[in-house]
């Protein structure tokens, strides 16, 4: 499978959790220092393996071991690109 936005990947999960590798962060995410800091704290950075879940208008994403779970609105999640694992 190829690279897709976090929003598209999460939508395909039908509410179940899914595993993906973060490939890149789009420019709209890169220019927001506060958002970048949140992503860094959660370990949601390129090459990180994350667990993703879709939830009404937002995407929940977490990296094991960080203890941080991010709820990203779709308008932000669509600028985080992932490749499905497994």
Which stretches of residues belong to each language-model region?
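Short, charged, intrinsically disordered terminal tails
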Residues: 76-86
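Mid-protein regulatory/catalytic core that forms ligand/cofactor-binding pockets
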Residues: 1-75
